[in-house]
A protein has these predicted regions:
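C-terminal segment of classical bacterial N-terminal signal peptides
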Residues: 5-10, 18-27
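Short, surface-exposed polybasic-aromatic patches that bind anionic ligands, especially phosphate groups
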Residues: 30-208, 213
């Protein structure tokens, strides 16, 4: 019996020695990477500064994350196709900022739905511009009136949309659940935002550029 026990102890000691000699590998949870791209050019943007000067004019691309629409959230940085890491927008934006951007986008989407004269590219340009306008006000870019070139979308339509978006935000704060994601990596960050009508708020306050109408 003593011989058997001795053999068992010797075997366990040998196994422990082998395991100790093996290299230790730390296991980390890999961060999910999302493919981001500027899939096509949709039209020209005029980077208008608050003093009225045009800082630059450029042909804007349609930003996408895994094929889904997204928006540039840093007008001062060039975009590069590639993989980016997704973060909840609340990690870098306040609740008020997220709500402002999300509701502005919601207004433009509703406007597009009722104005068939706008094509898909024009609609995207308007959405991208309201994102930049809201972020410029919060982040001090000094380009609160960035716009699509008037050759892309008329001044009258743009004025109506931008004024309407501001009115819609003021009329509907607290009526929607708003959120978003920011994708970071090499080059320009991009974002996605949404606004979902809260349960119990079935009546949405719609707006025009001049007045607020409640159904």
């Amino acid at each position: 019996m003593k011989k058997i026990w001795k053999r068992v102890c010797t075997g366990l000691l040998a196994l422990t020695t082998i395991l100790t000699a093996l290299p230790t590998t730390s296991v980390y949870a890999a961060e999910t990477q999302y493919w981001t791209e500027s899939s096509e050019r949709v039209g020209y943007i005029e980077h208008v500064m608050n003093d009225g000067t045009i800082h630059s004019t450029f042909n804007e691309g349609h930003m996408k994350v895994e094929g889904e629409t997204a928006y540039c959230v840093d007008i001062n940085t060039g975009f590069k196709n590639g993989y980016k890491t997704r973060h909840d927008a609340s990690a870098s934006m306040s609740t008020a900022q997220i709500e402002d951007v999300a509701l502005s986008l919601e207004y433009v989407k509703q406007y597009r739905g009722s104005h068939s004269n706008l094509n898909a590219n024009q609609g995207y340009l308007l959405e991208q511009c309201v994102v930049w306008q809201r972020l410029s006000e919060y982040l001090g870019w000094q380009c609160d009136n960035v716009r699509a070139a008037y050759s892309e979308i008329s001044q009258d339509i743009q004025n109506e949309v931008y004024a309407g978006a501001r009115a819609f935000v003021q009329a509907n704060k607290g009526r929607y659940k708003c959120g978003g994601y920011i994708y970071t990596g090499e080059g320009q960050d991009i974002g996605q935002f949404w606004a979902e009508l809260n349960v119990g708020n079935a009546k949405v306050k719609k707006t025009t550029a001049n007045e607020i109408v409640t159904n």
